[in-house]
Amino acid sequence: MKNFNTKRKNILKLTAATFAIIGVGTILFHSAAEVVLAANNGKVEKVPTTYQVSGSSETTLPKVTENGKDKESGSVKVNYTLSMDSMNTGTPTDTDLTMEEAAEAGAQYLRDIFVLDLEGAYVYMSYNPGTVTFPRAFWAGDVLFQKERTPESTRWTYMIDAVTGELFNISYDRQLDVSVPLGYDAALEDDCGIYAQSARNKTEECKLIDGSIDRIEYNCQGYSGNDPTISVDVIGGNGEIINMSFSRYDQTFLGLITDTSRKVTESALDNMVGEM
């Protein structure tokens, strides 16, 4: 069990370290993790790494209903171009949110957490019924303000429960226009106070945890493209954990992984170990 605990800790740290680029390939990340786990388990078997591709349909959502607001939710409607991602798409079931509903839920999370206005944005959606390392059906959104998508594009991404719309993770990815060191900063492991305070402020501002915050702990460091990152864990008095990522270059908030997402991943790993 000691070996597994070490492995799980490393995988969770890897998840946090690569969090800033999860939106560029959420499904690819989980698929790669499955390949690694299968190799580590000594199994010679195929695991899902690709998904069916269907034709891309594109539509622009209506701007207004009454007084510029949606009649049911009261939220302001905006124009953004919505497409099913041609690179990766599954087939949602009757109980899943539609692509349009999932996109609206994602847009609300982006407004609430990043204060992002999607007017004029391009939103690419992907549906996945779940993977070995994340066995929950989910919708993933990739949001840009340019039609062409490249690894260097500035983007906001999210992953939500396909049925309930609950947030699993959300992130912001950018390419810096300056060259900065990407190496490990040992001092931050002992003192990440500036990031801990930023995490506390964001958690309280967005009411991300039910109840009070118990403590904030250093998690790991990494980088996304040419942007050095640091992740910290915000731990609530009820045991809830939110993993947050920031830029080590200018302390910009880069996103978060929710407690539900963490529990889904850990449960999947526990089940995999139990089958060994």
Protein language model features and the residues they cover:
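N-terminal, intrinsically disordered, polar/charged segments of Gram-positive cell-envelope systems
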Residues: 2, 30-115
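Long, charged/polar, surface-exposed segments that mediate recognition or autoinhibition
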Residues: 88-100, 156, 160-215
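Short, low-complexity, Pro/Ser/Thr/Gly-rich segments in the mature regions of secreted, periplasmic
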Residues: 254-276
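Sec-dependent N-terminal signal peptides of Gram-positive bacterial secreted proteins and lipoproteins
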Residues: 1-35
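Exposed beta-strand-loop-beta-strand "reactive/processing" segments of non-cytosolic proteins
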Residues: 114-163, 214-259
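Structured segments of extracytoplasmic/periplasmic soluble domains
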Residues: 108-116, 142-146, 198, 202-206
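A eukaryote-biased signal for long
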Residues: 14-17, 73-78, 239
